[in-house]
Design a protein with these regions (language model features):
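Intrinsically disordered/low-complexity terminal segments and short unstructured peptides
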Residues: 6, 21, 67-69
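Sec/Tat signal peptide C-region and signal peptidase I cleavage site
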Residues: 23-27
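Cell-envelope and extracellular/periplasmic
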Residues: 28-221
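Bacterial N-terminal signal peptides that target proteins for export
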Residues: 2-13
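Bacterial N-terminal signal peptides
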Residues: 12-22
Length: 221
């Protein structure tokens, strides 16, 4: 093989590798920010899992505890749940209802989400009275707040952003579930904080708060 032919072969291989790499990147499954490490799922209700991928791509979902399928209300999870992305790249599937517990692992193709709990999930929506953070009430409840931590209570704060062109289909990538620790507590909704504490003391199961509050906004927002 002469040098010119050899260089052509190398160039062809390089182009092929680039195309394969691009295909792999495009085919990567993406989950919404709500479905992420540390999330809390609603107990004893069917659980929807959704996301995006290349049109026609097969998506496999496993829900695990200690590398084995966990028990669920009324039976056991199947080893694998599957879905296929539609022509717009959208896919979804439903897991069966589960009892409270955790932590669990959720595997979606090559994505692995850890530290997942099953308990009660509450939407904390409203105006400034719901938005008011714990940091604003520490003068009145300093001792109580500084003495309490509970990683079975978690909050996801929906950021105050808006889109005047179309409804939002996802949250920014930086949005994450945060456990109730001294590091995170000041950003919890104060009303949500005391409510979650009371609910945990009553039921002794994980509590998830989705804090979607914004002062001065109407309820339809």
């Amino acid at each position: 093989m002469n040098q010119v032919s050899f260089n052509k072969v190398r160039l062809s291989l390089a182009v092929l590798l680039c195309l394969c790499a691009t295909s792999m990147v495009n085919a990567k499954v993406k989950l919404p920010a709500l479905i992420s490490d540390g999330m809390v799922l609603q107990r004893e209700q069917p659980i929807k899992v959704w996301g995006t991928a290349d049109a026609g791509e097969s998506v496999q979902v496993k829900f695990l505890k200690n590398a084995t399928p966990t028990g669920v209300k009324g039976g056991k999870l199947k080893a694998t749940y599957t879905a296929t992305a539609d022509e717009n790249g959208q896919w979804s599937l439903t897991l069966p209802a589960m009892k409270p517990g955790g932590p669990y692992i959720l595997q979606v193709n090559d994505i692995e989400l850890k530290d997942i709990l099953v308990g009660d999930v509450w939407l904390c929506s409203g105006q400034s009275n719901m938005e008011l953070p714990v940091s604003r009430v520490t003068d009145m409840f300093r001792d109580e707040i500084s003495a309490y931590e509970n990683t079975n209570i978690r909050q996801l704060k929906v950021p105050n952003i808006f889109n005047f062109h179309a409804p939002q289909t996802d949250l920014p990538d930086y949005v994450a579930w945060k456990p109730l620790t001294q590091e995170n507590v000041m950003n919890f909704s104060a009303l949500g904080y005391f409510f979650a504490k009371a609910m945990y003391e009553k039921n002794n199961i994980p509590v998830g708060l989705i804090n979607s509050s914004w002062g001065g906004t109407p309820v339809e927002a």
